[in-house]
């Protein structure tokens, strides 16, 4: 089991540790709901050092990324970032990623922890036709996520850089609590916030400085409930190697006007199901629970849980393309009425 550079700090803060993608990470410190609401109302800090980081460099870095990713990497100026996906040749999704342009011929790709080895092998195979260098920087990169409406004001107290000039999806160098960092105004919670890329030896002092300044430490439990309220996908749940992204709410990522791996296969597939948001009248939905309509199964929950803001059980679910409802979710043998909800479940900041 791997440990992040913050492992000892988590234990000192009383974290309940769990195995996630081969890493020992905090599930929670106090309560998931308390940590969730701290991020929605003030500011929380997450250790996301388990995420993977790849550096892509070279004269053909952009050409390679245009082929390897579904979004238009050509629109990225230096110092900007975008959400994207790695398609496979069948039109499915190898992983969903964040891509940052660091220089004219240098990019940073952040990938999901469980997919680091798979993504690296996939990209290395694709890179053989391009003059490009691919480096796995995951082990020498620590990553913190400072999220919430008070994230900017808290972080401003620890850096000399004027953060008010930084927009969503900006990426830039800075010093935080006296340590060198790369900051990005990105996140996975639906709130304003920053992600801090650090050398492993700088992670603990910066993390503790953020906590001392008022950021509430938050674990994987709150990270998942926050992204669920925000209607964001989790790889392996809403997105898989078999998922056609054109049949999801994230079809906007796919730029059909450019060439990319698997484009023809993706465009040729008819959508047999669609992803919907559901708010239950009672009970807590979980992954794999059946969605019913007219007494018959028409879909399945891919992610479910309790929404601290709505104070209801909420779910992301795939249902048959023609299914219109009314829907129920089968919770422990009981068909619980579930109302269709637009996504996100809560307003994004």
UniProtKB/Swiss-Prot annotation:
Question: InterPro entries from the entry?
Answer: GCS_T, GCS_T_bac, GCST_C, GCV_T_N, GcvT/YgfZ/DmdA, GcvT/YgfZ_C, TrmE/GcvT_dom1
Q: GO molecular function: any one?
A: transaminase activity
Q: What class of enzyme is it?
A: transferase
The GO annotation for biological process reads:
glycine decarboxylation via glycine cleavage system
Q: Name one GO cellular component term.
A: cytosol
Q: Which reaction does it catalyse?
A: N(6)-[(R)-S(8)-aminomethyldihydrolipoyl]-L-lysyl-[protein] + (6S)-5,6,7,8-tetrahydrofolate = N(6)-[(R)-dihydrolipoyl]-L-lysyl-[protein] + (6R)-5,10-methylene-5,6,7,8-tetrahydrofolate + NH4(+)
Alphabetized, the UniProt keywords read:
Aminotransferase, Transferase
Enzyme Commission designation: 2.1.2.10
Summary of subunit composition and partner proteins: The glycine cleavage system is composed of four proteins: P, T, L and H.
What's this protein's family per the entry? Belongs to the GcvT family.
Q: What does this chain do?
A: The glycine cleavage system catalyzes the degradation of glycine.
Name of the molecule in the record: Aminomethyltransferase
